[in-house]
Amino acid sequence: MNIVDKFKEKILSGELISKKEAMILSKENIDELASAANDIRMSLCGKEFNLCTIINGKSGRCGENCKYCAQSVYFKTDIEEYNLLDSESIITSAISNYNNGVHRFSVVTSGKKITNKEVHTVCKTYSELKDKCDIKLCASHGLLNYEELVKLKESGVIRYHNNLETSRNFFSNICTTHTFDEKTHTIKNALKAGLQVCSGGIIGLGETMEDRIDMAFTLRELNVDSIPINILNPIKGTALENQEKLSYDEITKTFALFRFILPKKQIRLAGGRALLNDKGERLMKSGVNAAISGDMLTTSGIKTFDDIKMIKELGFEV
């Protein structure tokens, strides 16, 4: 039995691998890792594939300095800027996505956090939406406090999104206007408020494979439910506009390792899919069991109809 199969069997027997073991796996053959990750997904998660969509509920003018982000005031980009969308626009989008076969819908807003007034506004929208549509509600409104997160829960939100973005060690290389600890504090408060949590990051920022593995282990310690992994799509005008893109092999290895580290969780293919020549099909054979469909915040995505067709052809149930 080779090393990949040895660790696969360890996971299938109910144990978890250590960081040292994950680092060993990171040096192994990509195809073997991907195949084993797919076996783990099939054995522990089954054929269910979770599909979500997002709407950019408030765009641009963000005071944070995340180097990858087109919405930051620190960078000159061509993105559209607007205040919080009206409830009718959000509700119409959610119902449309639900009718297209999407399971989850999230309103994502720019900025470190939304204001108290905006919390009240979105909660009212979520309450209205809950009465009109059965789609599961997610929210991504920045570094909210416990009381604000409780209000979201009471208005019908099931899952809160707050990405770690990268490892604790690498975080200050991409952002200095807020901290890694502020993010983990928000995640812990969301869990305390009774919300599920969606948290992952971006790969291709200049981090090492060890950074990605460290992030995965932090997410495991936090016990988040869904792990969205974005592939950096360098945007002109941002600090990372000339960042070298990762190879598909490197991307595949990363996704497979996340399945080894987080065997029972939703490993979600997120932004950057448009960079992949197969729309992420290879990754869906390498441990992925969830995806964000449709357009991302500031970049184009994959149409939901095309996603569902591909996902079903791969043997998943949507």
Curated annotation (Swiss-Prot):
Pathway: Cofactor biosynthesis; biotin biosynthesis; biotin from 7,8-diaminononanoate: step 2/2. CDD domains: Radical_SAM. Its cofactor is [4Fe-4S] cluster; [2Fe-2S] cluster. It comes from the Bacteria. GO terms for molecular function: 2 iron, 2 sulfur cluster binding; 4 iron, 4 sulfur cluster binding; biotin synthase activity; iron ion binding. Belongs to the radical SAM superfamily. Biotin synthase family. Homodimer. This is Biotin synthase. It comes from Clostridium botulinum (strain Eklund 17B / Type B).
